[in-house]
């Protein structure tokens, strides 16, 4: 029997400056602390990926964004329309069913398949890393680290700050990690 993983997301992006590399599309600019992009998922044409295949589903659902992963060792993600630089990204994530050993999280600086990621699992672990050249690499840690701040059976409010080369993860309004990527 295949196990299912469901996650609902609600996003808020805050801009604090600009990317250090040349993007393929213009960077959206705002003053520090201003909301640059906010998504309620009420409009199913707002630009997020809609996928239905044997591996899973990504789609708008009841005012949220649902990600269902049907197989082990699979990753599904979607990014908002636009190009953002230094950001604060926030989302509420909920596991609806499936095992507690799972992953949900946030990304920043997605460019040509490369990005930073901030992940948590319902069994209480987190990690910060980057995906580059087809490889996932954890930054500042050798493996996922346990924290008491993750709610196994509830909503987890995640926040990721990508400011310059500093990457910071918050879980339920508590900073759990901060690291530098040189």
Residue ranges and their predicted role:
Residues 25-52:
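Extracellular carbohydrate-recognition regions
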Residues 19-21:
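Bacterial signal peptide processing site
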Residues 15-17:
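C-terminal motif of bacterial Sec signal peptides marking the signal peptidase cleavage site
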Residues 43-73:
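Extracellular glycan-recognition surfaces and repeat-rich motifs
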Residues 134-157:
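Short, aromatic/His-centered strand-loop micro-motif at the edge of beta-sheets
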Residues 69-133:
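Secretory/extracellular carbohydrate-interaction modules
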Residues 170-182:
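Short, solvent-exposed beta-strand-to-loop segments that form ligand-recognition rims
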Residues 154-168:
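Localized edge beta-strand/strand-to-loop motifs within extracellular or lumenal beta-rich domains
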